[in-house]
Amino acid sequence: MPNIVLSRIDERLIHGQVGVQWVGFAGANLVLVANDEVAEDPVQQNLMEMVLAEGIAVRFWTLQKVIDNIHRAADRQKILLVCKTPADFLTLVKGGVPVNRINVGNMHYANGKQQIAKTVSVDAGDIAAFNDLKTAGVECFVQGVPTEPAVDLFKLL
C-alpha cells in the first residue's frame, strides 16, 4: 500500500504553503500532483518545481496514471498527494487510491460558489463530490496551514 502522508485539495497545486509548510509538516519526500492538464504542461510543472526544496521529488501525473500506478510506490516514498478539486479526489478514490483523509486548502471563490471558510468556496458540484467522498468513508477537513486548527468540512456545508 502506498505511503500517502497527506492528501490535499488546492487549486494552486504546488505553491509556498504546500511546497514548504505542508511538505515539512507531513514529512513528505515526494509530491504527487494528480491533474490531467498539468501532467501535459511543462511550463506549469517547471514553475511548481521551483517551489520545492532540494531533495523533494515531484511527479505530475494524470488521474488515471495515479490510479494505475500508485500501488507500486515504495514504502520509503512519503507521498503528499495534491489535486485541484474534490471531484478529482473522488475519481481517485473510486479508482482504488487509498485516501482516508483530505486536507481542504484553497478552493477560490467564483460566481456560483458559496464561501464556507476563509480559503474555501464551493458550488453544487463540489458539495456533491464531498458528500460522495463522505459516503466512501473519507474524512475532509479545512486547514490552510499546519498551525491553524483543522475544522470538519461537513460542519461547514
Swiss-Prot record:
CDD domains named among the record's database cross-references: PTS_IIB_man (cd00001)
Boundaries of every PTS EIIB type-4 domain copy: 1-157
Entry annotation: catalytic residues: H15
Principal localisation: cytoplasm
Subcellular location, record wording: Cytoplasm
Record keywords: Cytoplasm, Kinase, Phosphotransferase system, Sugar transport, Transferase, Transport
Major enzyme class: transferase
PROSITE patterns the record matches: PTS_EIIB_TYPE_4 (PS51101)
GO BP term, pick one: phosphoenolpyruvate-dependent sugar phosphotransferase system
One term under GO cellular component: cytoplasm
Record-listed E.C. numbers: 2.7.1.-
Domain of life: Bacteria
Coiled coil: none
Record GO terms (molecular function): kinase activity; protein-N(PI)-phosphohistidine-sugar phosphotransferase activity
Function text: The phosphoenolpyruvate-dependent sugar phosphotransferase system (sugar PTS), a major carbohydrate active -transport system, catalyzes the phosphorylation of incoming sugar substrates concomitantly with their translocation across the cell membrane. This system is involved in N-acetylgalactosamine transport.
NCBIfam families found in the cross-reference section: PRK09756.1, PRK11425.1, pts-sorbose
Entry text on domains: The EIIB domain is phosphorylated by phospho-EIIA on a cysteinyl or histidyl residue, depending on the transported sugar. Then, it transfers the phosphoryl group to the sugar substrate concomitantly with the sugar uptake processed by the EIIC domain.
Protein name: N-acetylgalactosamine-specific phosphotransferase enzyme IIB component 2
Gene: agaV
